[in-house]
């Protein structure tokens, strides 16, 4: 079995309890120092993590920061006072690590900014989110201060101002991190920062793991190299406690929340105690038997279950890699949660809109396969179903086809129907047909006269006023109306004249029938069904000439021609010669003539040759 990496110098064997005892036995002067604000590292400008002091000047820095400074800096000098450095010493240990040992162990290689595209996108995306949150907090503060009861809301204003300060602090850390990326800082130094690692637990980033970290570390191997793993875990856990988001967070409003506080902020100075618990748990059980419930108890239940699971995954990846903390940070790869693909999947990274803060719920369970389907915001906009996510078959963003429903695309226009037959000859209209009974049976039970120029929509008209108006009438075709003389079946536009002495039926007393009906379909749809012969030659041309001659509007020509036809029929001096098979037109009643004239005007057969 391969031995663990020796990039970190062997430390003197010391138990984790020694760290706790050294902190418990403090002088009064050290207690006063606890009350003072914690110093910041002059290299990273953040709170010192894994405090390490220099040999001669005793200035303190982060362990990772001073190691990177001594290896890639101008020389073994203090970053603050330029005093030569012969060795460094971690707080809580007696081991002195010389500069020669640090250089022999290897330094994190500087990385070009173009090689950290993903890391830069991760940080830049979080910076934009911080700026949006600050603007939102400013709007809420302004709205709360302008209210009349602002004194009662003073605690809320103080809470909002505190959240704004925390957001500004996080924004400054992220901007410095992005500046380091632009200036070619090593990937290990970027990924090991608490400002970057907290993005992993805020559901912004997903770890793609290491290809050589699949074999779990056994308890025997862990105990044989306990000094190495003690130093590795201490460096890792010191950073992670400042990265894990606390379970309870203040809310900006009723809809939005933000990770303001970490486990370090709410642990009340119990970081070393938590580190001791986790180290003892790994020493007793190994990495295979780590239980989320027990790890949560070791973290004092201050983080959510989701964060605990992500923390265990990172912890196992580090230990199973058998690398130091910096080496592991330089080797592991991360991607934005909304991206699909990656080098580990054999694909190019497919990026989507960075404004999406969280991954959609339907994609969160699909992490078993390394070949992720492409997901874009257009799938939801255009109504695509997400069932394909469970079948493993990506679906196009747009659903095209005859049965597709697209809210952004109008329905196709209906195909226009063919032109109907021109009309019915006069001889057929005035001749009794043997098929009148069958035509009558095909007709509707009620026949409605429709006038397009009537303005009395939905208004009830008295019977006396209806005779002088154009209100549609409804006639019944029931067997009780035995005096029927003329029947118009307008559903298929077929007119049938009967030579029996029957009068028109009375209008049906029906409130719904008294209301005017509108054409639901174009008139050509009715003309297609009419069983007619060709009109006399030139009749339609004469009607067109009349329309052009008097410059009739096309929308009102039908009504004007109906009135003209009615007046022309009344003024007829000589009646038309009647036959034995057709009734005398001169004997028609005015209502019968109006019915006939209405039909003629609709079919275009209006003009009568003298």
UniProtKB/Swiss-Prot annotation:
Q: Compositional bias of type Acidic residues: which residue ranges?
A: 448-470, 478-487
In residue numbers, where are the RING-type zinc fingers?
Answer: 41-82
Q: Where is this region: Disordered?
A: 1-36, 390-411, 431-515
> Which molecular function GO terms apply here?
zinc ion binding
Keyword field contains rRNA-binding: no
Write out the biased-composition intervals (Polar residues).
1-28
Disulphides = none
Q: Which UniProt keywords apply?
A: Metal-binding, Zinc, Zinc-finger
Tell me if NAD is a UniProt keyword of this record: no
Per UniProt, the ranges with Low complexity bias are 432-447
InterPro entries referenced in this protein's UniProt entry, alphabetically:
RNF141-like (IPR047126), Znf_C3HC4_RING-type (IPR018957), Znf_RING (IPR001841), Znf_RING/FYVE/PHD (IPR013083), Znf_RING_CS (IPR017907)
Q: What is this protein called?
A: Uncharacterized RING finger protein C32D5.10
């Amino acid at each position: 079995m391969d031995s663990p990496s020796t990039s970190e110098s062997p430390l003197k064997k010391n138990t984790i309890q020694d760290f706790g005892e050294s902190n418990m036995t403090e002088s009064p002067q050290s207690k006063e120092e606890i009350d003072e604000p914690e110093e910041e590292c002059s290299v990273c400008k953040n709170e010192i993590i894994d405090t390490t002091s220099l040999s001669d000047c005793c200035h303190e820095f982060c362990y990772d920061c001073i190691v990177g400074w001594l290896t890639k800096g101008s020389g073994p000098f203090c970053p603050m006072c330029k005093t030569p450095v012969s060795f460094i010493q971690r707080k809580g240990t007696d081991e002195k690590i010389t500069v020669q040992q640090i250089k022999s162990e290897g330094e994190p290689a500087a990385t070009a900014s173009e090689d950290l595209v993903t890391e830069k996108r991760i940080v830049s995306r979080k910076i934009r989110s911080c700026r949006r949150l600050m603007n939102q907090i400013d709007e809420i503060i302004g709205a709360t201060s302008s209210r009349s009861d602002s004194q009662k809301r003073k605690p809320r204003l103080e809470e909002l101002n505190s959240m704004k300060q925390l957001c500004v602090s996080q924004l400054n850390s992220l901007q410095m991190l992005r500046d380091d990326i632009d200036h070619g800082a090593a990937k290990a130094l970027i990924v090991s920062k608490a400002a970057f690692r907290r993005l992993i637990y805020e559901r912004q980033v997903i770890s793609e793991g290491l290809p050589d970290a699949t074999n779990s570390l056994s308890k025997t191997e862990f105990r044989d190299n306990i000094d190495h793993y003690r130093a590795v875990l201490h460096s890792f856990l010191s950073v992670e406690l400042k990265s894990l988001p606390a379970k309870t967070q203040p809310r900006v409003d009723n809809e939005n929340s933000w990770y303001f506080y970490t486990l370090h902020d709410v642990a009340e100075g119990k970081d070393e105690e938590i580190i001791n618990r986790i180290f003892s748990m790994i020493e007793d059980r190994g990495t295979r038997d780590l239980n989320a419930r027990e790890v949560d108890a070791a973290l004092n239940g201050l983080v959510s279950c989701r964060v605990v699971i992500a923390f265990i995954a990172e912890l196992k990846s580090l230990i199973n890699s058998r690398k130091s903390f910096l080496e592991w940070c330089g080797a592991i790869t991360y991607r934005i949660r909304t991206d699909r693909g990656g080098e580990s999947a054999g694909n190019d990274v497919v990026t989507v809109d960075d404004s999406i803060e969280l991954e959609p719920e339907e994609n969160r369970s699909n992490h078993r396969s390394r070949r992720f389907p492409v997901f874009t915001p257009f799938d939801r906009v255009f109504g695509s179903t997400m069932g394909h996510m469970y079948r493993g078959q990506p679906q196009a963003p747009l659903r095209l086809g005859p049965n597709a429903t697209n809210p952004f695309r109008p329905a196709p226009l209906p195909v226009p129907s063919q032109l109907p037959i021109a009309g019915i000859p006069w001889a057929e209209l005035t001749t009794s047909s043997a098929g009148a009974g069958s035509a009558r049976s095909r007709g509707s039970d009620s026949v409605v006269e429709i006038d397009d120029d009537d303005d009395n929509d939905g208004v009830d008209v008295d019977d006396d006023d209806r005779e002088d108006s154009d209100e549609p009438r409804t006639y019944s075709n029931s067997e009780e109306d035995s005096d029927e003389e003329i029947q118009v079946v307008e559903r298929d536009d077929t007119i049938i004249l009967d030579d029996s002495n029957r009068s028109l039926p009375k209008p049906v007393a029906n409130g719904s029938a008294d209301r005017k009906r509108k054409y639901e379909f174009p008139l050509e749809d009715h003309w297609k069904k009419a069983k007619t012969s060709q009109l006399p030659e030139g009749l339609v041309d004469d009607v067109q000439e009349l329309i052009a001659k008097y410059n009739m509007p096309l929308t009102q020509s039908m009504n004007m021609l109906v009135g003209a036809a009615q007046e022309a029929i009344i003024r007829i001096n000589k009646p038309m010669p009647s036959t034995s098979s057709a009734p005398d037109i001169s004997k028609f009643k005015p209502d019968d003539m109006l019915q006939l004239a209405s039909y003629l005007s609709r079919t275009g057969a209006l003009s009568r040759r003298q």
